[in-house]
Design a protein with these regions (language model features):
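Thiamine diphosphate
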Residues: 75-210, 214
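Hydrophobic transmembrane alpha-helix bundles
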Residues: 31-48, 129, 165-180, 219
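Conformationally flexible catalytic loops at phosphate/diphosphate-handling active centers
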Residues: 5-92
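Single conserved hydrophobic/aromatic residue that forms the stacking wall/gate
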Residues: 1-11, 208-218
Length: 219
């Protein structure tokens, strides 16, 4: 699952040429996939019923396929980077190499956070930002590799509200990563940008400069 804001940044800016992308596509595999897909040129009737005696097993059997996705995405991100000169990873870190306070989010607000990080690091603040490019499957290993070893406090921002839940999805994923591994970390969750409400540099700045997690939530 790749997250995009939609209206705000979903317009075409610089389209990559299909001929340049073609070497990255396994055309034989693509043809084989299409040969088994539904097509009005050779119609067929298919059912989707699975009996309860094997449904559970079928759902679990796909785990290996999903587990392989992060490495595949990382590989093709590197290949696209060779074409464009813009290299991305599943989790991109930006900021001070010895950051103690890090904000985690995804989508267009990352650019606002990036400018805020520039402003604060220029003044000697040890802060950073992690921009999530691949949310599902969530790769704990790639995530931890992106977090500076010096980090003491994480602020995880979600662009959704889950009424009744203990926290929003990205926040809970990050908490789970640290809890399962017994790694001590102060983690606070927050929300931003619902219904395209603007997120300002001043608001991001408060996440870094608030003296305590409780104050961060209030900001």
């Amino acid at each position: 699952l790749r997250m995009s804001r939609g209206l705000g940044d979903g317009y075409k800016r610089q389209a990559l040429d299909y001929d340049a992308l073609r070497p990255l596509v396994d055309m034989d595999a693509l043809k084989a996939f299409r040969a088994h897909s539904l097509n009005p040129e050779h119609p067929a009737t298919r059912g989707t019923t699975v009996n309860p005696d094997i449904f559970f097993q079928c759902r679990e059997a796909c785990n290996q396929k999903f587990a392989a996705i992060p490495e595949a995405v990382e590989h093709y991100m590197a290949e696209i980077g060779k074409l464009t000169g813009r290299t991305h990873h599943l989790f991109d870190y930006y900021g001070a190499p010895d950051a103690e306070r890090v904000v985690i989010l995804m989508g267009s607000a990352a650019e606002t956070a990036r400018e805020t990080v520039d402003y604060l690091t220029a003044r000697g603040e040890k802060v950073g930002l992690i921009n999530v490019h691949l949310y599902r499957p969530f790769s704990a290993e790639h995530f931890l590799a992106a977090v500076p070893a010096s980090c003491k406090r994480l602020a995880v921002l979600d662009r959704t509200k889950e009424p009744g839940a203990m926290g929003e999805p990205l926040y809970q994923d990050v908490c789970t990563v640290y809890q399962e591994r017994g790694i001590p970390m102060t983690i606070v969750g927050g929300r931003y940008g619902l219904s395209s409400k603007d997120t300002t540099p001043g608001q991001i700045c408060l996440l870094y400069t608030s003296p305590s997690p409780r104050d961060m939530r209030r900001s």
